[in-house]
Amino acid sequence: VFGPRLVGQYSSTFKNIFGSELIVAYFIAMIGFLLAGFCVIGLTDKSSLLRLPVVTDNTSSKTKLDSKATQLTVLLVVNHFVMVIIMAATPLHVQDIGETIQVVGTIISYHTLGMFVFSPVLGRFVDKVGSKKVSITGGFILLISCICALNTSDIVILHLSLFLLGLGWNFNFVSISSEISKYSIEKNTNLNIKSDSFVFVGSVFAQSSLGLTYTLIGFEGLVIFGTLAAIFLLFNLVRLSSKLLT
């Protein structure tokens, strides 16, 4: 969030040294991301990381994948993947169309506002109306944000798109995580650590491959890919809502 703001004050200096002032902004973000990752990994049960939840078959005593927990984890990962690829590619695109680093900072600020502005009340809202309604609403918002982002040359629309992208992500993340937490209590295990570890790795993969992908297919291609993933997410949220969500 503060990367573009901090860099904006010295953008000409950084551009002369590194060729692009965005390099420093991304570097600041990468350091914060890695520090957060190390903290999470250091404070969690290592045996739970990157392991899909399993259950024991009562008839054969063999373990098999826990279908509900696995499906919820996949939905959570796809939701995060859609958000990350568009969020991380937008600063590159905005600079490519000739806008300043200050505009990049404003767009990311709008996005962050969408991600967290309703967080203090969203958990209670999920408890009141149910995770099913909240997640399907989030799926629609996420898809609308991707469609808005297809209008790649309009800066005002990009501000709206990134705000909705954060908002839809937040609706889905809170509602699906809430369902995973309830299922964890039911199964007497910590499924949140497992699901969050997959979200973290998915985020690393999406961001680390972004440069090459952006070069190959451009911002429009990434947005189309994100739109298809958002359609997949919404379709499965609707299709599986009666089985997975309350």
Per-segment meaning from a language model:
Residues 171-184:
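Intracellular juxtamembrane helix-capping segments at the cytosolic ends
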Residues 133-148, 227:
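Structural signature of the two symmetry-related core transmembrane helices
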